[in-house]
Amino acid sequence: MEIGIWGMGRMGFNMARRLVDKGDHRVIAGNRSSGKVDEAVKNGAEGSYSVEEFVEKQASPRVLWSMLPAGDVTDKMIDRFVELGDEGDIVIDGANSYFRDSIRRAEKVRNAGLRWLDAGVSGGVWGYEVGYCTMIGGD
């Protein structure tokens, strides 16, 4: 499976690493700072250094997974996914967002013809070893 994860903080980085190491998935890793992307590439992911490249590197229908903190930064990233994505792409919010924010984002994504998953992630940085718990809702 091909999965794009944007946000190579502690959670996003280790999730990408686990998907490559233990799941044999093609992972496209994106982050605003290139050092984090370079580190993900060393661990087997494919790097993307801009949101445009992140979207372009994936075949449609894409999995556009945001692993950014809840709040404004997540809103801005989802706006970019909607702007650059194609009908049928799947947008995933991995932040543990306030439910009303998730409802608002879901409506925006669906209105653009994309699919939505709210997938708050738990498991901390040790999730690489033992796996992650995701609380998923959406399309």
Enumerate the language-model features and the residues they cover:
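NAD(P)+-binding Rossmann beta1-loop-alpha1 motif at the extreme N-terminus of oxidoreductases
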Residues: 1-62, 85-88, 125-128
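Rossmann-fold dinucleotide-binding core
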Residues: 3, 74-77, 98-139
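Active-site-adjacent beta-strand anchor residues
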Residues: 30, 67, 95, 137
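General beta-strand structural signal in soluble alpha/beta enzymes
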Residues: 48-49, 92-93, 115-119
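Beta-loop-alpha module in the N-terminal Rossmann-like domain of NAD(P)-dependent dehydrogenases
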Residues: 52, 64-80, 98-101
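ADP-ribose/adenylate-binding Rossmann-like module
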Residues: 66, 82-106
